[in-house]
Amino acid sequence: LVTRVFPDGIDKLPKYSTPGDPRLMEYYEMALAAHVAPAPKFATEYRSLVGGIAWVGPSERPDALHANGSCARAYTFSTVELYGCAVRILLYLADTCELGITFSAYAPNADVLDAASDSDWHVTRSTSGGGLRLAGGTAHAVSRKQDSGSGSSAGAEIIAASGLCDDIAHARGCLEYMNLPQSAPTVIDVDNKAVYDVSRNYSATKNLRHLDRRAFRIREYTFTNVVAARLVRTTENWADMFTKVLDRGPFLKFRRLVLNPIDSVVARVSAVIGGIWAPT
């Protein structure tokens, strides 16, 4: 894909430390408002580029999942600005092609599944983001547009968390089939207190009565000991990577948590050999 898009190579092109352009969502909102169908040739080039990048997103490079997903929403009303955002994603992936998800038995609690959920609220349809980690690496990641709009950030966060709980329930079933049962509820990190409170309380409030009953599945999964919500700061919620365009600092911090790069694994193995640290 890089050779086809850049036949002269990428050595003289800009280097990017993050895949998402700072104005990505602004460009998307402008394109959505205009909603002008592109020329057929440009539309084909755009879909080819964004569709090609999408192949590596969920399974190999979830760090680019949100940026690519945002570009993919504009298939029918793509613009030159969004094409430039897609080119940036491709350049970022090409410059960091040595990165990937690393699973290691030396990761802390390697046999325990953990998760994180987040949402980016919009007036129209918000973005649900989250992931499941096992053995240090992200085994499953999502960044998807919600089925319907939500009138509040709390509602969008609840919908996102409940959707990820379905994925957690499926993953726990697969792990049990693979002889790796989860003896305790899977911890899911959330950074919204409304989600945390809803998961622990069956009562409803007037501000949340507009949500469908299915949006409260996190509460049902909590009371059946499938998940356990944990309230964390936004700066500690690695699912933020799947819902927002982050600056370099927080992006690199969350990328290490999501990908578990090989240098982290080597450091742990060296510590084990030296008797400094032992896996749990």
Predicted regions, residues:
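Long, low-complexity, charge-biased intrinsically disordered regions
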Residues: 1-280
